[in-house]
Design a protein with these regions (language model features):
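Structural motif corresponding to alpha-helix initiation and N-cap regions
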Residues: 16, 40-45, 70, 94-95
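A short acidic, often aromatic-flanked loop/helix-cap motif at beta-alpha or helix-coil junctions
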Residues: 16-17, 35-40, 118
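Short, conserved SAM-binding/catalytic segment
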Residues: 23-31
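N-terminal Rossmann-like dinucleotide-binding module
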Residues: 1-17, 21
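Short beta->alpha connector loops at strand-helix junctions that form conserved
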Residues: 30-35, 83
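Donor/substrate-binding cores of folate-linked one-carbon enzymes
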Residues: 12, 58, 62-162
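Short phosphate-binding loop-to-helix
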Residues: 35-66
Length: 163
């Protein structure tokens, strides 16, 4: 039993399936696209306003492929968590970490970490290895299974520790 629930979903793509899923579950949601703003700072200011209006105190990233800027970090430092599909520091910052770790046959695993000013350089919270498979599709499936197993456990521990 989790002491908190997902109360808000945000996407940086208006057509993201997660927004449809949130609607079906009755979870408040919104989307903004960077191209709608004159600068990343303006984009992040608008996002912070939305998050503050929803009283969000912990941000969980999944598939958010933008670098979190100083506007977000100033407001939510130590409150943004990311899941990365490699055993960091291997393939930090790579948008193709699954493919690259599979091809290299190292860095095989996932990492849950706090977001800081760098790219995939924040404090590591948890890591688990993922067994190599010669098929990229099978390996990718294993990575996603590991993410779905570890991420909720880590978040639950963080929430319980904050209370």
């Amino acid at each position: 039993d989790s002491p908190k629930v997902v109360k808000f979903v945000f996407s940086d793509h208006h057509d993201a399936y997660v927004l449809e899923r949130a609607d079906k579950l009755g979870v408040a949601n919104a989307s903004l696209e960077l191209k709608e703003f004159t600068s990343k700072v303006d984009y992040e200011k608008a996002l912070v306003e939305i998050l503050e209006a929803q009283e969000i105190d912990l941000i969980l990233l999944a598939g958010y492929m933008k670098i979190i800027g100083s506007t977000m970090l100033a407001r939510y430092k130590g409150k943004i968590i990311n899941v990365h599909p490699s055993f960091l520091p291997d393939f930090a910052g790579s948008p193709h970490a699954i493919e690259e770790s599979h091809e290299a046959k190292y860095g095989l695993g996932i990492t849950i970490h706090y977001v800081d000013e760098g790219v995939d350089t924040g404090e590591i919270i948890a890591q688990i290895p993922v067994a190599y498979h010669e098929s990229l599709e099978v390996y990718e499936e294993r990575v996603h299974e590991a993410e779905h197993e570890l991420y909720p456990k880590v978040v639950r521990q963080i929430i319980l520790h904050q209370q």
